[in-house]
Each structure stands twice: as C-alpha cells, then as structure tokens.
Amino acid sequence: MSTFNSYSQPKESNDNSHNNVNKSKSLLDIIFGTNVSEWAFSENALMKAMDLKIEQEKTKQQYYKLENLNRSIELFKLASSSGLPINQIHKLFNTDHGVPASSPMKAGGNQPHNNTEGTQSSENLPRLNGSMKSLKPLNMNTVSPTPMSRQPSPYKFPASSSTGGISHSTVTNVQRRANSPARIGASAVAALNDNISIKEEDVARRIPSGTKSQESPLNKKPTSLHSRNLSLPIGKFTNPNIPSTMTSILSFNRDQQQPLSQPLPPPPQQQQDLHTHNLHTIPRKPGMVQKKHRRARSTSSFGVIDLSIIDEAKEKQVQRSPSPIHSNVSVALTSHDKPIESNMKEQPNMLQSVREGRQVHDDLDDRTCSESSSRNESPVRTITKDNSVGKILNST
C-alpha cells in the first residue's frame, strides 16, 4: 500500500503541474509546441531557450556514448574470461548494418553515435552468460556476409586445355563458329573445286577413250573459247547458215568495188570466186578474229589528196591516146588532103578519144577531190589605175 501511495502521489502532483503548465504556457512548450505563433516573450529569451535545448541534446548523446562504452567493456571482459580467440572477438561488436563497434583500445577516439548499439549489446549479455562456455572458435568461411558487404564475384576463365589433346569445350566452340572467315573461305574453295571437276568430266567425255593421257586433271585447260570478240564485225562467218558471199561491214578494199566505167558487172561465179579468195587466203582459228594490217589508200570517201596519183594519171593518159588538142590538129591537117568521106569515117574515132580524155580527167578529179575548173589557169588581174598605196611606194 505504501508503494501504491507513493506512486499515486506523484501522479496527482503531475496532473496538477500539467494543468499549471497549460495555464502558464511554459517557455519550452511554446518553443517546441504548437503555439509558436503566440510567442509573447522577447527575442533574446527565444535564443536562450534554443541554446538550452541544444545543450540538452549534447548531454543525451554523451550519455549514450558512455553507456555504449561501458557495455562494450563488459562484453570484452566476458569474452576474454570465456576463452574466446582474440581474432574472433571483434565479431561480437558487429551490428546488423555491417558497421563494427569500437574496440576497447580505441573507445575514446572512435565511438558510435547511436544508443541502439548499447541496448543491443545489453540484450546480448544475458544470452552469452549461459552459452559462453560452449563457444567454439568460429571459422571465417562459415560467416555469411551481410547484404551491404557482399561483392560481385569476379569472372573465372575456363581451365587451360591439357597438352595431350584438345578439351571438349574448345571443340564445341569451333563447331559453333560456323560463319568464321576460315570456314567461309574453305567452303568457297570446295565449291570452286567441285565446279572445276564437273567441267573436267565434261571435257573427258568429249575426248575419245584412246586419246586420254595420264596428265593430272588440274593441268588440263578447258576448251571453252573466248567469245567476246564475236560481237565485232568479221570477214568470215562461222555459222554454216550464212552464205560465204556476204562480205564484212567494214570492208574498204577498192578491188571489190565495181568501177563506174564498167557497163556490165562480172559474172556471179567470178564474183563468188573473188570473195572466197579474199576470205580464205589466210588460215583462221575457229572463234578468233584475225586482224590484218592494211595501209589505207587515199580515196574519195576519206577526202585525202595523194599528189602521186596525178603523175600516174598523166602517164596513163599519154600511153592510152594523144591529147584532144593533137587530135584536132591532125584532123585539120589531113582534111585538105583526104576527101570528105574519110573525114566522116574518122569522126567516131575522134569522139571516142574525146570521151576517153574526159573520163581520165573525171577519174583524176575523183581521186584528188577536185573540180574540173582547177585545171584552168588562174586569171591575171590587170591594174588600170595606180592606187594610193602604189603611189606612196613609188614616191619613196
């Protein structure tokens, strides 16, 4: 009863003081309560109250530090008396957050700032009293790491293969790399060899069995011909359907061209013989184009003038017949001696000689790309009056 009375009296006194505090509104309640807006004291009093609150908090923190230090000393004494190894004692001061508690030797300089550590160590003390005698040395590998202290495991390379042979892992890796450059190149070479072997088999089938040699199939060359030049115009046609009388498109041989002066073309048999002679004089390889170096003569189609042709034409003209002028003179001289009947017989010969002379001149004009007026002499300019330039030159 006495204890009940002792507890009841302070309770009643606390209720009375609480009523008095609500009425008087103490300074601490005004600072840290809900009635801060109703502050009725000076500003200096408010600053003093804040300084007082700060000192109270510092006192509390110092008290918790000392309490934690005392609990740690007691725990250390209990562990040393129970025979715990020295290298395992520091694990008793580890907290749940992975931060170890300060050892007794460094307690003055490094102390935790939480009061929870002291309470946890005090809770562990009663448990250690009964089971400290049965403690055994702990193993470092058996301690499970905390979530904060856990680190990712490093990458481990596979074990090196034995010297006697290749390991199974390397074999599987080689098989998986199907698109490696070496395998791609090997497959391409294999495909190329297959194509070559197919072509060689085709060639071997065409050759008779008695003519086969003992050479290696790699040394044999395919008999396929290069057919790119067949698109060009050639003089000989390999197709039997095309007649041999057809000539090439690019043919500049003047011997094959028919002159204008001939009234009748040669017979078709002679023309065919001429073409076949020109086309088959040089031996030709099948499928290949034979190139003949021909020095192009100056013709009217090219417009090139060759002055040596003029002398040749003059010589031919002299050899064939005399000039029309001499023929006219001879006709004039003999007209007085011979009768009129002989003149009538010689007129066709004179006309023929005139035509031949004109034809020679026309051929000469065609070869030299000139006109008939070029054979006439150039007119001489006659100066009737002296010009001013001539007077100036004569005066000087």
Swiss-Prot record:
Q: Where in the cell is it found?
A: Cytoplasm; Nucleus
InterPro entries associated with the record: DUF2722
Q: Which GO terms describe its biological process?
A: cellular response to methylmercury
Listed GO CC annotations: cytoplasm; nucleus
Keywords of the record = Cytoplasm, Nucleus
Q: Name one Pfam family in it.
A: DUF2722
Q: Where is the composition biased (Basic and acidic residues)?
A: 355-369
Q: Where is this region: Disordered?
A: 1-22, 98-126, 145-168, 203-239, 254-274, 355-396
Biased composition range(s): Polar residues: 111-124, 159-168, 210-230, 370-396
Per the entry, what this protein does is: Involved in resistance to methylmercury. Overexpression suppresses a PAM1-SLV3 double null mutation.
Q: What is this protein called?
A: Protein BOP3
What organism does this protein naturally occur in? Saccharomyces cerevisiae (strain ATCC 204508 / S288c)
Gene (name only): BOP3
